[in-house]
């Protein structure tokens, strides 16, 4: 299926954003480890979170997390520290995503994990048990989800956890998000130096908890505001002082012409009348916003150089290659370097007359390219249903904002 999109001449809308996927998934694991009754409220309705809920509540011996990478990593650590024998698997793409770094770390703590098929990749057979190890050293540039997975089980380890990170630490805000949520549930977990984290063997407390709205989802509305001639967009459920690292996107979008006003219910986006001539930005802490800013900058004719993108190659797809391929359809030639830098210097080619954007089973490809309809009235998005992974109501919300969406021709 494809969606053919058309955009209104001006955007005026109030949008209730989905709950944060990042917070929901962490809160669910911590709640399960607390063994309490107060289930977190306002959980995300996205695929990833629903997969997590099913895995934690049904207790099946074989757990299929489909395409949910967060669930694969968090559940691998959770199941390793919880009595029981389980096999955890996923889609074909999930079985191609490496997990050896996390498995090796868990084995150092005493976990019993076997690879069912290919060494270093899911599916995994996990025999949960009490883990007695307490010291782990990891490179700081590994996925922050590996680090978060280990941190969250720290309080239930017999001797707690001392985690040392070497070299550059990527996605530090996601690590801080995990630590803050752990503290909210009564854990003693903190940085003891710039590279070391200490988690004491202190049980979680089950407490009432409400999940805030998703700043990652907000980024697509910032993008729409930046690309639209006129925009007045209210987004509810967002906080000025958010746990989410992606809230930094507001600062970056301010340089691309979008002003943020904080209100009692959330935020209001308007044009601020200014836009930089070039954007150089390090995305090491906000990798999930990279696709949004690539499309936005190019369509605003703002050359850019984005660094810190090393984690993009192991996401739902190789996002660097996907961006280069799909942006070329719109007439933009991007260049990458060292698997971590993506740039556009203004180089153009003839655009396709009716571009069809391939989404590669990646929700963020669909949502980052859909706002391009403001500049490309014939654009089509392939496999639009992929947005259910993080923002199931995305297309309905676009309709509320005045976008035309109809099923395109295959």
UniProtKB/Swiss-Prot annotation:
Highest classification ranks of the organism: Bacteria, Pseudomonadati, Bacteroidota, Bacteroidia, Bacteroidales
EC nos: 2.5.1.19
EC category: transferase
NCBIfam families associated with the record: aroA
GO BP term, example: chorismate biosynthetic process
Family statement: Belongs to the EPSP synthase family.
Single GO cellular component term: cytoplasm
Family matches, as CDD domains: EPSP_synthase (cd01556)
HAMAP family noted in UniProt: EPSP_synth
UniProt-recorded name of the protein: 3-phosphoshikimate 1-carboxyvinyltransferase
Family annotation (PROSITE patterns): EPSP_SYNTHASE_2 (PS00885)
UniProt pathway annotation: Metabolic intermediate biosynthesis; chorismate biosynthesis; chorismate from D-erythrose 4-phosphate and phosphoenolpyruvate: step 6/7
GO molecular function, a single term: 3-phosphoshikimate 1-carboxyvinyltransferase activity
Organism per entry: Bacteroides fragilis (strain ATCC 25285 / DSM 2151 / CCUG 4856 / JCM 11019 / LMG 10263 / NCTC 9343 / Onslow / VPI 2553 / EN-2)
Encoding gene, per UniProt annotation: aroA
Localization (cell): Cytoplasm
Primary residence: cytoplasm
A Pfam entry, by short name: EPSP_synthase
Record's function text: Catalyzes the transfer of the enolpyruvyl moiety of phosphoenolpyruvate (PEP) to the 5-hydroxyl of shikimate-3-phosphate (S3P) to produce enolpyruvyl shikimate-3-phosphate and inorganic phosphate.
Keywords: Amino-acid biosynthesis, Aromatic amino acid biosynthesis, Cytoplasm, Transferase
Assembly mode: Monomer.
InterPro entries linked to this entry: Enolpyruvate_Tfrase_dom (IPR001986), Enolpyruvate_Tfrase_sf (IPR036968), EPSP_synthase (IPR006264), EPSP_synthase_CS (IPR023193), RNA3'P_cycl/enolpyr_Trfase_a/b (IPR013792)
SUPFAM superfamilies per UniProt: EPT/RTPC-like
Active site: 288
Superkingdom of origin organism: Bacteria
């Amino acid at each position: 299926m494809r969606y053919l999109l058309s955009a209104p001449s001006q955007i005026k809308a109030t949008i209730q954003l989905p709950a944060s996927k990042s917070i929901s998934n962490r809160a669910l694991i911590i709640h399960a480890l607390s063994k309490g009754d107060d289930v977190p409220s306002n959980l995300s309705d996205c695929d990833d979170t629903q997969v997590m809920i099913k895995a934690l509540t049904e207790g099946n011996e074989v757990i299929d997390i489909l395409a949910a990478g967060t669930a694969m990593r968090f559940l691998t650590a959770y199941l390793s520290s919880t009595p029981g024998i389980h096999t955890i698997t996923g889609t074909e793409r999930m079985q191609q995503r490496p997990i050896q770094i996390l498995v090796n770390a868990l084995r150092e703590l005493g976990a019993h994990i076997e690879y069912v098929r290919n060494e270093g990749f899911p599916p995994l057979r996990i025999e949960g048990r009490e883990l007695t190890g307490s010291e782990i050293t990891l490179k700081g540039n590994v996925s922050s989800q590996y680090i978060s997975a280990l941190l969250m089980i720290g309080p239930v380890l017999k001797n707690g956890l001392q985690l040392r990170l070497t070299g550059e630490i990527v996605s530090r805000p996601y690590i801080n998000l995990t630590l803050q949520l752990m503290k909210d549930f009564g854990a003693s977990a903190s940085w003891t130096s710039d590279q070391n984290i200490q988690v004491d063997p202190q049980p979680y407390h089950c407490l009432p908890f409400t999940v805030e709205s998703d700043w990652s989802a907000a980024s697509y509305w910032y993008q729409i505001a930046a690309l639209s001639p006129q925009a007045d967009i209210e987004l509810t459920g967002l906080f000025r002082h958010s746990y989410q690292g992606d809230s930094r996107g507001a600062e970056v979008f301010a340089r691309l012409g979008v002003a943020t006003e904080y209100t009692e219910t959330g935020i209001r986006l308007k044009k601020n009348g200014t836009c930089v001539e070039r954007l150089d930005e390090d995305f090491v802490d906000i990798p999930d916003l990279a696709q949004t800013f690539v499309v936005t900058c190019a369509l605003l004719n703002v050359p850019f150089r984005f660094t810190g993108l090393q984690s993009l190659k192991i996401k739902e797809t190789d996002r660097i290659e996907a961006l280069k391929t799909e942006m070329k359809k719109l007439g933009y030639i991007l260049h990458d370097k060292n698997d971590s830098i993506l740039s556009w210097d203004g180089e153009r080619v003839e655009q396709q007359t009716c571009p069809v954007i391939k989404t590669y089973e990646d929700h963020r490809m669909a949502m980052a390219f859909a706002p391009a309809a403001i500049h490309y009235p014939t654009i089509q998005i392939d496999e639009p249903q992929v947005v259910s992974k993080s923002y199931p109501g995305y297309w309905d919300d676009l309709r509320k904002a005045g976008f035309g969406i109809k099923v395109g021709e295959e």
